[in-house]
Amino acid sequence: MNIDKIFENPSNLRSFEFNNDVCKVFDDMVSRSVPGYHNIQDIISLTYDEFSQNRVFIDVGCSTGTTIAKILSENQVNYCYGIDISESMLAIAQEKCGEHESLVTFKNCNLLNGTDNVINSEKVPDFIILNLVLQFIRPPERKKFITNIKSLCSSSTLMLVFEKIIFNDAEINMKYIDSYLKWKGKNGYSESEVSNKRKALENKLIPYLHEENIELFKSSGFNSVEICFSFLNFRGYLCRC
């Protein structure tokens, strides 16, 4: 696994994007930047196994395909879809899932622009994965994004979402941010790396309040929303129609 050293260099202080350099180190970056990341992978795989009836799922923002590869290796899967806007990410995902290539289709597309020809009508998913994706979608477009994804799936779809959040209480919010930054330091990032990445993510990663996420999911057609993961300022949501 390539080690993330992107933000060691101050010259990389530009707006964050999932370019080729980020893709090369993404697996290391996300495991050292998201508290409980490996637990999140376990939750996704176990929840899929319990809830998916069709045994067909769609991972939107699949990045390097880690989640897809895990589900394929641990569960019965009839088919799955990996969607991402980064061709570099998808190239890695295809290689990672190579031994299961007959069971997966990868698509380079932005579902905000439409959903034509994304899935096979005979292989309809009933399980949606949105792992740390919505926070990178502009707030006014999030409901449309979810609605478009939901339109691809069966009427009994379950959606699993993981997001970074903010808190109503300003003091609690700042203390949890400080705790999160300390946690990243314990994972080998220097203070300058943490600071540089934080600046690069400004106006790119926009977290919602917990209550805003609940309202978003319910207004998008999910009647039941439950918490399935909580660690510092990260939450997991189990959303059911």
UniProtKB/Swiss-Prot annotation:
CDD domains: AdoMet_MTases. Coiled coil: none annotated. Catalyzes the conversion of S-adenosyl-L-methionine (SAM) to carboxy-S-adenosyl-L-methionine (Cx-SAM). S-adenosyl-L-methionine binds at residues 37, 61-63, 131, 198. This is Carboxy-S-adenosyl-L-methionine synthase 1. Keywords: S-adenosyl-L-methionine, Transferase. GO terms for biological process: tRNA wobble uridine modification. Belongs to the class I-like SAM-binding methyltransferase superfamily. Cx-SAM synthase family. PANTHER family: CARBOXY-S-ADENOSYL-L-METHIONINE SYNTHASE, TRANS-ACONITATE 2-METHYLTRANSFERASE-RELATED. It catalyses: prephenate + S-adenosyl-L-methionine = carboxy-S-adenosyl-L-methionine + 3-phenylpyruvate + H2O. Its EC number is 2.1.3.-. It comes from Yersinia pseudotuberculosis serotype IB (strain PB1/+). GO terms for molecular function: carboxyl- or carbamoyltransferase activity; S-adenosyl-L-methionine binding.
